[in-house]
Curated annotation (Swiss-Prot):
The keyword Ribonucleoprotein applies. Part of the 30S ribosomal subunit. Located on the platform of the 30S subunit. The lineage of its organism: Archaea, Methanobacteriati, Methanobacteriota, Stenosarchaea group, Methanomicrobia. GO terms for cellular component: ribonucleoprotein complex; ribosome. PROSITE patterns: RIBOSOMAL_S11. GO terms for biological process: translation. GO terms for molecular function: rRNA binding; structural constituent of ribosome. This is Small ribosomal subunit protein uS11. Keywords: Ribonucleoprotein, Ribosomal protein, RNA-binding, rRNA-binding. It comes from Methanospirillum hungatei JF-1 (strain ATCC 27890 / DSM 864 / NBRC 100397 / JF-1). The gene is rps11.
């Protein structure tokens, strides 16, 4: 690595209410450097989306990225979107905080949830889900 030239990457955080997935790529997004998901750090399925799992994943991902020479990350947060919920799950905020705490420099934080301009018909039928 040359002096004065810092290597940056992009952390793609997909946070739903069932799981959290963190993928670190180069700036173009073409090459995956490291990735981690909730099932890789916790045993129970119900804990995959928890903030604790997100913190563990972020620590693992930050360590692997630092070994490859990356000093900072731009963060792209994504929720399921489209016909599902448009707010990120509980692991998103914890993952960003843990990345910063692990010594990675944080650049841009961007929400890239796919939002439809003319929504598809929601599931549940004409009268909706009756509870």
């Amino acid at each position: 690595m040359s002096e004065g030239k810092e290597k940056w990457g992009v952390a793609h955080i997909y946070a739903s209410f069932n799981n959290t997935i963190i993928t670190v790529t180069d700036l173009t997004g073409a090459e995956t450097i490291t990735k981690s998901s909730g099932g890789m750090v916790v045993k129970q399925d119900r804990n995959e989306s928890s903030p604790y799992a997100a913190m563990q994943m972020a620590g693992n991902v930050a360590q692997a990225a630092r070994e490859k020479g990356i000093v900072g990350l731009h963060v792209k947060v994504r929720a399921p979107g489209r016909g599902k919920q448009r707010s990120p799950g509980p692991g998103a905020q914890a993952a960003i905080r843990a990345l910063a705490r692990a010594g990675m420099r944080i650049g841009l934080i961007e929400d890239v949830t796919p939002v439809p301009h003319d929504s598809i018909r929601p599931k549940g039928g004409r009268r909706g889900r009756r509870v």
